[in-house]
Amino acid sequence: MSIRCAFLFPGQGSQSLGMGQDFFNNSEVAKKMFIEASIQTGIDFSELLFEENPLLSQTEYTQPAILLVGAMAHKLFTDETGIKPVLTMGHSLGEFTALVAAGALDAVDAVKLVNLRGQLMAKACSKQEVGMMVSLGLSDDAVEKLCEEQREAGLQVWAVNYNADGQIVIAGIKKDLELFAPMVKEAGAKRAMLLDMSVASHCPLLESASAPLEAKLKEMLKDDFISPVISNVTAKAYDTKAEALDLLPQQLVKPVLYKHSMANIDDEVDCYIEFGHGNVLKGLNRKATKKPHFNVSDMASLEATIAAIKELDV
């Protein structure tokens, strides 16, 4: 197959009741992965995902659930097509699923790893009320300048996710974000709203989580990448265990350069395939690319994506 595919994986915020259930009900391969992940982590994923469960909003449960469904979707697609990506990329948590797709992490090991990542992040944020907010319609420079000015004034706020032009997520202490939101609107943002997040991702508040995450990564990462992975920290490709060990702990405390990553890779690919529930990244990519973007989130979208890729490759 000559078509160049980039495999994409979403992060936190893409979770939803019932995600992965269609795979579980209709694929023995998916069911086996699901059961093995439940045994290895001690998390009953069917109870977590297929029934109303408040735990799904807690990061130590959200992260393994999202990764599991994304890895499941990816496995079913690649088992049926044999397609290898020219590169893999994820948004925040999604970078770990991208490592699974690149062959550098076993899927169930990765579920365990991000369960730990969530626990470490929750612990790092447990002594103060933290949060995240999104700014829409303001430039990167304007948001960064505001953050810097307000940090000098004593607020703890950082620009942490560069998602798309005019869309930036800010993390910090919750009461500081509540003070900061009206300042962002006054500066010209169309919207500034707090997100339903229990942690403050990709900022210095997570410093204490980096070392223990790195220690676990050393145990689990493999050095046999089948494709490069795009780093959230640098917006550039890496394909060795040593690079991953350097970059992934940094990812906890440094911004996600998602829109920069898209700009860097768009000329190298013919289409994007997003694995996991929903199509969050398709929305972010609308302004960044004119290339086709497919999503694999259930059995119907799996078959539709396979058919569409065959059409593109004629």
Segments the model singles out, each with a brief description of its role:
Residues 2-143, 271-300, 304-305:
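FabD-like malonyl-/acyl-CoA
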Residues 12-14, 103-252:
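Alpha/beta catalytic cores of group-transfer enzymes, especially the acyltransferase/condensing modules
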Residues 24-25, 149-150, 185-187, 286-290, ...:
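Short, solvent-exposed amphipathic alpha-helical segments in soluble enzyme
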Residues 62-64, 200, 255, 259:
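Glycine-rich phosphate/pyrophosphate-binding beta-alpha loops
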Residues 78-81, 185, 266:
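Non-catalytic positions within long, well-ordered alpha-helices that form the structural scaffold/packing
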Residues 253-270:
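A short, acidic, amphipathic alpha-helical segment used as a generic capping/interface helix at domain edges
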Residues 305-312:
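Short amphipathic alpha-helix with an adjacent loop that forms part of the alpha/beta core around
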